[in-house]
Amino acid sequence: MKMLTVFDPAMCCSTGVCGSDVDQVLVNFSADVQWLKGRGVQIERYNLAHEPMSFVENEKAKAFLEASGAEGLPLLLLDGETVMAGRYPKRAELARWFGIPLEKVGLASTSCCGGKTSCC
């Protein structure tokens, strides 16, 4: 199976739920990472603040930092090749990269509201 390597900018944690500010993009991406792992995808994440040597030891990450600086992160490598930089991918993009079908989420066929129910 393919391998995704994520080089995150310096941050306190990778979940997006750090301190008083919640970064919804990171929250979504963290959920998507767990979704991928649940489907057997191997993922490595490195945080510039906590694992700077991982950036130095990886030629692609090192060259990227030299050219774009930390403000250009995140950097995503798929099997060692750059697939995205500067933003986190959406779940649909991740699914496409790994050939994983997205589950369709549909609307309920009937509503609980109306009629003689008291649910609303």
From Swiss-Prot:
Q: Which UniProt keywords apply?
A: Arsenical resistance, DNA-binding, Plasmid, Repressor, Transcription, Transcription regulation
Coiled-coil ranges (or none): none
What molecular function terms (GO) are annotated for this protein?
DNA binding
Example GO BP: negative regulation of DNA-templated transcription
Which branch of life, at top level? Answer: Bacteria
Residues of the signal peptide = none
Outline what the protein does.
Answer: Inducer-independent trans-acting repressor of the ars operon.
The name this protein carries in UniProt is Arsenical resistance operon trans-acting repressor ArsD
Q: Which organism is it from?
A: Escherichia coli
Q: What is the lineage of its organism?
A: Bacteria, Pseudomonadati, Pseudomonadota, Gammaproteobacteria, Enterobacterales
